[in-house]
Amino acid sequence: MVTMDRTEILEKIKQAEIKVEEAIRAAEEERKNKILEAKMKAREIIESAEAEAVKVKEDILNSARQQIEAEKEEIRKRETKNIEDYAKKGKDNIMKAVEMLYNEFVGMMEHA
């Protein structure tokens, strides 16, 4: 039978403790690295989401601007037509008024 003396046993225990401490340090280092990687990935995700939010905001604003411009153009066309209609009616009314005044004038001249 193999027997170990006390020093050998203590040395083996010490070696085992060193290995355990090294494993703990390696696990702690790996944990720190994983946390750092997770934070970096989270930062990338946040930055990407912020950039996407800016793009979506710009798209919404551009769409709203285009819609406003289209509505302004529609209103401008409609009001221009209304003005043209009023101008035509005004000209027609002037011609009717001139004709009526002319007829009255002629009628007055005939009775004078």
Swiss-Prot record:
InterPro entries: ATPase_A1A0-cplx_hsu. This is Uncharacterized protein AF_1158. It comes from Archaeoglobus fulgidus (strain ATCC 49558 / DSM 4304 / JCM 9628 / NBRC 100126 / VC-16). It comes from the Archaea. The lineage of its organism: Archaea, Methanobacteriati, Methanobacteriota, Archaeoglobi, Archaeoglobales.
